[in-house]
């Protein structure tokens, strides 16, 4: 979680190798790293693959650069595409992207465009989250400074559009906000729902 791709990859490699020295890893272990588009380099991606990281997840959020700027994201959609290419060149074949709906000023058409674009990228997994404005957060305190949030009808339509477009692209929903191609369901996500044991480090 967080943005581990922001730090030197040697630290990630040393951490994974330390864990391998302390624990027995299954031969088909799934190790995921979260990346902020724009922070991934060829060197980092190669280091991740070399130490056994075999799944990468990008916090894309939207394909609309205006939306990304409004959200205060440091990346553009073009940065994401570049990071996606880097990941694939390094050898990643299990790639996920996070997108968001019900954002300030976001129309159903805006969100549909993002979904259609993401569905055509050849990803194995998509996490589609609906914005929830929590009290005592920066967004809650400054909501008046943003465009209006979508109404309930639009938010409901965004939910249905997510189902329709991703299903049409071969994804199935296996958890509340997560969609995967067959065989690419996140083991980390599934472990929560199946109440399996895990260690938080």
Q: Where are the predicted features?
A:
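C-terminal scaffold of the Radical SAM
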Residues: 1-201
